Amino acid sequence: MELAILMLTVGSAVVEIKCGSIYRLEEAYTIFLNGEERGTTQKVVTSLFNLSPDRDYLLQLAGEDGSIRGEISFHTKTETAVLNVRDFGEQDDTVFIQAAIMACPPEGRVVIPPGKYRVTSLFLKSNSNLELEEGAVLIYDGRPGRLPILPGLLSGKEENSFALGSWEGEAADMYAALFTGCGAENVNLYGKGEILGGASMEDWWSEENRQSSPHRPRMLFLTHCKHIRVQGLHFSMCPSWCIHPCFCSDLGIYDVEIINPEDSPNTDGINPESCEDVEIAGCHFSLGDDCIAIKSGKGRRAQENPVPG
């Protein structure tokens, strides 16, 4: 059995078990890390969490008969600092989480420990790791009056116009996502935490709000970003598209779960738009629309920025 490492951070890894299956394995395997049992898996793409930074690991998978079927060695990344968001305040979840993100030194790690956090919009910072520990729940406070708006086009010389907000392939004003990345690079967003969009037919999914401008927010929106990795998170009740990278390159999305009601409108799972080098593996979808929709823009935006989609 061949194993491959798809993603590495300071405290996690994603391993692919290459055995001919697509999502679920025919049998369960016991996971051993440096000889210590770490549970079982029956998924082709499996996440490993609670690893130590800058450490050598030997991963071994044992079959039901106890024999080792495959193994691979890897070394976790080095980190410069660990920032617990609870050290940055107690009154406004959005502000103290954002403060921790902005204060994080290059290659540091921001940790969101178990608990419930009500947030509006958080903005990602380059060269950082953001971990949602198991039991951490981010609840999107999506009241329009509290959300930042991303303009469709930033003002400036027409030949140097910069599209920020987006809707259905064209530059358009939109509400900022729970996680927004603008020109961010080298970011890992991972963990076993949950992200609840809180949408319903009474608000974001209503006929009125489906067509209104600014347009509905995503859960993770990335524009002009590079070298981004997303792992292990659980998303649900998204106002519209869940993960929407736009004009991004070198993006990996692994072992995430996206759950929305079957009658929820336009709640696509992952929609890469005008992106390059995108890898999506081991994800689970149960949605009201497309699981994955590859887009390339349209109209003036597609003509001025002819990036393959």
Residue spans for each PLM region:
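Extracellular/periplasmic carbohydrate-active domains that bind, remodel
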Residues: 1-309
